Amino acid sequence: LVGVLRTIDTGRASRSVLPSGHYAAVLEVAPNLGIAVGTDGVGSKLIVPEQTGRYDTVGIDCIAMNVNDVICVGAEPIAVVDYLAVEQTDPDTFAAICRYWL
């Protein structure tokens, strides 16, 4: 898949500064100016909270992993965008997960 993506010319002005495989992408937006973009979810890290019923560390983990990925490419984190995808809504669980997002 990565090989196929490398062959696509999008015609966009910005280009990736780093090769594929890094935890975050750095896009050139002007000469000598880039912006780092990263995304990461909690994935399998939800297994323990589901077993213990304690979700208050999930939000911390979301933020920490995204910030860490941006730092790993030498960028300074300035903003985080995340989302919460759930099958069913539970206000208490939602509040626990989001407690440390803000």
Predicted segment positions?
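Extreme N-terminal cap/leader segments of soluble proteins
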Residues: 1-54, 73
